[in-house]
């Protein structure tokens, strides 16, 4: 198969950490052609989705992990699979790229279908913070708002809260709110851009000191997990914010959460997803570019990326003759 990965600049990807690299390596091990492009390479040409594409040779255990063998301009329908793994934030350029990806199978008459994951319309519609609110029985007390007084009222009710930007990643812009903090008003002003930008405010969960659990789901089923434990001087467990990763297992509550959200994820076209769980609560659903595969491999002695690529092959085998 020809698998096109739409990613950040290749030179910024880190082998041993970036899930996109692990997936490319697994695809190459399985004998598939690995292509790469950036969001800026996508375009519509003669009414067809197309891109400037790099054909890669993947080098396991080497830096850089790839060689660009060729650069060519192709209709995106030339790929058998397109994997959209551009990191957030979801900018206007990102949204435009999903519109281009909607056109991949438009007007083709060859009986084939290129599989695009996650589904472009789902990437547009399902904000990674707000998506979890479709499951009100699973999430902690939450308010999404812009006004300072609404946030202060929430803090008064719950004692402490966490404020998050709706378009952040890797723990960026996340702060702990407490009435006793003399910086409280300044944090709210900065987070909301003086009341002009919506934020999410959630009840602070004491269990977050023990870590937040990243659970990776493939086609709605959990295939691995890790625990991200924050530093003593931080409330964020994200790896990008200095959190450490710890081996973990799924509790019955974790499995219940997966059973509830899994069918909805698949229905919305989200086949590869990372959900975040703190204690008994779902806090986030990561659909754009979920990570954690490399760390789970090391912690659990597995090779999840091989399992994922094998699933992809089996799932898309009939896709050449059916409409996904």
From Swiss-Prot:
Cofactor binding, note field: Binds 1 Mg(2+) or Mn(2+) ion per subunit.
Catalytically driven reaction(s): gamma-L-glutamyl-L-cysteine + glycine + ATP = glutathione + ADP + phosphate + H(+)
Listed GO MF terms: ATP binding; glutathione synthase activity; metal ion binding
Pathway named in the protein's UniProt entry: Sulfur metabolism; glutathione biosynthesis; glutathione from L-cysteine and L-glutamate: step 2/2
Keywords, in A-Z order: ATP-binding, Glutathione biosynthesis, Ligase, Magnesium, Manganese, Metal-binding, Nucleotide-binding
Record flagged with keyword Ligase: yes
Pfam families, per the entry: GSH-S_ATP (PF02955), GSH-S_N (PF02951)
Residues annotated as binding Mg(2+): 284, 286
Keyword Chaperone: no
Cofactor(s) for this UniProt protein: Mg(2+); Mn(2+)
Domain of life, source organism: Bacteria
SUPFAM superfamilies recorded: Glutathione synthetase ATP-binding domain-like (SSF56059), PreATP-grasp domain (SSF52440)
Enzyme type, top EC level: ligase
Binding site for ATP: 155-211
EC number: 6.3.2.3
Example of a GO cellular component annotation carried by this entry: cytoplasm
Residue ranges constituting the ATP-grasp domain according to the UniProt record: 129-313
Protein family: Belongs to the prokaryotic GSH synthase family.
HAMAP family: GSH_S (MF_00162)
Protein name: Glutathione synthetase
Species this chain originates from: Gloeobacter violaceus (strain ATCC 29082 / PCC 7421)
